[in-house]
């Protein structure tokens, strides 16, 4: 199957998957799944539109797309087609096919509740459409997927009881807020920034496409700027990582590390190396007084 069968384009509104109208649908679905699996959860929470060109989809094919993307943590917003339902093309009017969102969420939750990682720690995503107050900077924003390593029943109760949320910010940046301590064996992966209100214990791992901010002690594995950004930083009340990586730069602590200072610290790239220094509040340049 040629690479031209699927073209993926990104914009401020999310991702659009353009599918070859002449290619066998089952092959296209398999190719999409391969691409999503290889993304290693970095696309979690992304909004997706599928453009099928002049293809006229059958109901089972529509349902296949509705279940495929949510099963990898993406939000399917619509399926675009130039095909007329009765085969007439006197007016090339785009038809937008939208599935039942509640049904999509039910299927996605079922898939994740029955899935376990190889290390035995369950990874679950909650797709419920709980809207937060427009005046609150933190909330469960509609159409956003939430990632957690806790069992699914931790999402019971009202939105205020939930232990993870999306912080909506200006521009296209998104931040995953985790309000708990990460234990050994737990892994969090997110394409944006990650903020943790708690500690990160040894054996836990945090991978972020942007910055990692921990309001506690970080003793696990950190990888900020995982998509290649040298501008990403890792900051915590105390930085004691077993491994710290920013973009492609990696560092480890000495075998016999001292307890260290009692103040917030920040790790960033300086002169091609990962450096850890004191964080000075209110500065434009981390580690330096204004």
Swiss-Prot record:
Protein name as annotated: Probable septum site-determining protein MinC
Subunit structure comment from the entry: Interacts with MinD and FtsZ.
Family: Belongs to the MinC family.
Keyword Zinc: no
SUPFAM superfamilies: Cell-division inhibitor MinC, C-terminal domain (SSF63848)
Lineage: Bacteria, Bacillati, Bacillota, Clostridia, Eubacteriales
InterPro entries: CAP/MinC_C (IPR016098), MinC (IPR013033), MinC_C_sf (IPR036145), MinC_N_1 (IPR055219), Septum_form_inhib_MinC_C (IPR005526)
PANTHER family noted in UniProt: SEPTUM SITE-DETERMINING PROTEIN MINC
UniProt keywords, alphabetically: Cell cycle, Cell division, Septation
GO biological process: cell morphogenesis; division septum assembly; regulation of cell septum assembly
Function statement: Cell division inhibitor that blocks the formation of polar Z ring septums. Rapidly oscillates between the poles of the cell to destabilize FtsZ filaments that have formed before they mature into polar Z rings. Prevents FtsZ polymerization.
Name of the gene encoding the protein in the UniProt record: minC
């Amino acid at each position: 199957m040629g690479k031209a069968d699927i073209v993926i384009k990104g914009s401020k509104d999310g991702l659009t998957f353009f599918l070859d109208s002449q290619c066998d649908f089952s092959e296209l679905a398999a190719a999409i799944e391969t691409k999503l699996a290889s993304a290693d959860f970095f696309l979690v929470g992304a909004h997706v539109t599928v453009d099928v060109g002049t293809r006229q989809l059958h109901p089972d094919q529509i349902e296949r797309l509705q279940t495929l993307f949510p099963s990898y943590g993406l939000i399917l917003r619509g399926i675009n087609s130039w095909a007329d339902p009765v085969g007439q093309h006197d007016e090339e009017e785009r038809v937008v096919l939208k599935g039942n969102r509640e049904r999509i969420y039910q299927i996605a939750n079922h898939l994740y509740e029955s899935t376990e990682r190889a290390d035995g720690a369950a990874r679950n995503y909650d797709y419920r459409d709980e809207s937060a107050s427009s005046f609150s900077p933190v909330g469960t924003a509609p159409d956003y997927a939430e990632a957690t390593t806790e069992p699914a029943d931790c999402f019971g109760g009202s939105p205020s009881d939930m232990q993870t949320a999306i912080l909506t910010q200006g521009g296209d940046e998104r931040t995953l807020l985790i309000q708990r301590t990460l234990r050994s064996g737990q892994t969090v992966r997110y394409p944006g920034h990650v903020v943790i209100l708690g500690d990160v214990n040894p054996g836990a791992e945090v991978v972020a496409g942007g910055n990692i901010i921990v309001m506690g002690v970080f003793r696990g594995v950190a990888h900020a700027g995982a998509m290649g950004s040298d501008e990403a930083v890792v900051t915590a009340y105390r930085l004691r990582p077993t491994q710290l990586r920013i973009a492609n730069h990696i560092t480890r602590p000495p075998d016999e590390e001292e307890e260290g200072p009692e103040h917030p610290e920040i790790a960033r790239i300086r002169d091609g190396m990962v450096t850890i220094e004191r964080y000075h509040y209110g500065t434009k340049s981390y580690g330096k007084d204004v």
